């Protein structure tokens, strides 16, 4: 029997956890890979470990990539740089970590190659996002082609959240029966506070705004999700 395998790039945050629960519904064997790059919100690594165990996935690999910290100066890799909602002179937020998704997706692909997975799943998004260039659809598709050529194997990059806004991402978690798990147990906050977070950093504001919109109009947001994704309709309370 052909076993369908996937590798999820997993931070323990809202987006990657939503991708994980979706992957568990569609693949026979799900692996997760988490990266320790010296991030200031290091609690996310332990959050990822706990959730991986809770969901009973096939394997969870935590990789030390702190070398990225030496090269990528960002508010997420330097405690002395305060997180700011303002854009820098280059038009990017100071939470952008140069090369992060290039490295993560490349290493996840190597891991997928080793375990025989057909897909690498990442929660990047171009709809409600922080302006990071390595979250764009164009980038993901380009790197996917390069990686497949370099490995001489077709490993498919899946981006299930790419065209969903944050409200629709909450709807997707709800569709798979894990709205409260994602809300209460994931860590998205740049200040390392799980659940609803600090409420003031850019990540928390984006997450909270999406949740409020979803809770105010579940039926309407879910209808949009069905239209965008082609998921079969089912009752969501």
Curated annotation (Swiss-Prot):
EC no.? Answer: 6.3.4.20
Q: Which GO terms describe its molecular function?
A: ATP binding; ligase activity, forming carbon-nitrogen bonds; zinc ion binding
Q: Which catalytic reaction applies to this protein?
A: 7-carboxy-7-deazaguanine + NH4(+) + ATP = 7-cyano-7-deazaguanine + ADP + phosphate + H2O + H(+)
- Origin: domain of life: Bacteria
CDD domains assigned: QueC-like (cd01995)
User: What Pfam families does the database record attribute to this sequence?
Assistant: QueC
Q: What class of enzyme is it?
A: ligase
Q: Which keywords accompany this UniProt record?
A: ATP-binding, Ligase, Metal-binding, Nucleotide-binding, Queuosine biosynthesis, Zinc
> What does the entry give for GO biological process?
queuosine biosynthetic process
Chain residues that bind ATP: 10-20
Q: Which Gene3D superfamilies match?
A: HUPs
User: What does the cofactor field's note say?
Assistant: Binds 1 zinc ion per subunit.
**Binding residue positions for Zn(2+):** 189, 198, 201, 204
InterPro entries from the UniProt entry: QueC, Rossmann-like_a/b/a_fold
Query: HAMAP family from the entry?
Result: QueC (MF_01633)
Q: What does this protein do?
A: Catalyzes the ATP-dependent conversion of 7-carboxy-7-deazaguanine (CDG) to 7-cyano-7-deazaguanine (preQ(0)).
Instruction: Report the family membership.
Output: Belongs to the QueC family.
Question: In its UniProt entry, what is this protein called?
Answer: 7-cyano-7-deazaguanine synthase
- Source species of the chain: Aeromonas salmonicida (strain A449)
């Amino acid at each position: 029997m052909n076993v369908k395998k996937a590798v999820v790039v997993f931070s323990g945050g809202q987006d990657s956890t939503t991708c994980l629960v979706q992957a568990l519904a569609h693949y026979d064997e799900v692996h997760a890979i988490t990266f320790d790059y010296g991030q200031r919100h290091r609690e996310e690594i332990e959050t990822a470990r706990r959730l991986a165990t809770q969901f009973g996935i096939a394997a969870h690999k935590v990789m030390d990539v702190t070398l990225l910290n030496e090269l990528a100066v960002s508010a997420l890799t330097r405690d002395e740089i305060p997180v700011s909602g303002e854009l820098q002179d280059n038009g990017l937020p100071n939470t952008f970590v140069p090369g992060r998704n290039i490295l993560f997706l490349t290493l996840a692909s190597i891991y997928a190659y080793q375990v025989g997975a057909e897909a690498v799943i990442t929660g990047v998004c171009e709809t409600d996002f922080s302006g990071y260039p390595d979250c764009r659809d164009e980038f993901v598709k380009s790197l996917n082609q390069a990686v497949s050529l370099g490995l001489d194997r077709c490993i498919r990059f899946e981006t299930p959240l790419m065209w969903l806004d944050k409200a629709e991402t909450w709807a997707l978690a709800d569709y798979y029966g894990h709205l409260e798990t994602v809300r209460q147990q994931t860590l998205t906050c740049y200040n390392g506070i799980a659940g609803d977070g600090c409420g003031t950093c850019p990540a928390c504001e984006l997450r909270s705004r999406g949740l409020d919109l979803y809770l105010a109009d579940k039926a309407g947001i879910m209808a949009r999700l069905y239209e965008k994704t082609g998921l079969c309709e089912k009752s969501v309370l």
